Amino acid sequence: MWIQRDPLGVALVIAPWNYPIQLSLAPIVGAIAAGNCAVLKPSELAPASSAALARCIGEFLDPDAIAVVEGAVEETQALLAQRWDKIFYTGNGRVGCAPPPVVSPTIVARFCDCML
């Protein structure tokens, strides 16, 4: 078996409020394992989990490889306006299935796991 790691660059992970730790860390682990850097935006609806993730990731992981941005809709929109090589979104179908112009026009890949 041949495995070739081909990092994409910087991934944005927008995580949901239900299972906030697991659904935040699973895509982050995959992104980092593949050689990418990642930015995590945990749900504002789980503030204790969001704060714990920000504290632990900031304390124990390389800040050059992974960052956490806490906030609500305004912060999420600001993140989506940036250039990303991959966006991994888990959450509401209304938001996740938004037309591509809502996100950065330079996006290479977008993965949405939505509940419709």
Locate predicted features.
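Rossmann-like NAD(P) dinucleotide-binding subdomain of oxidoreductase/dehydrogenase enzymes
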Residues: 1-116
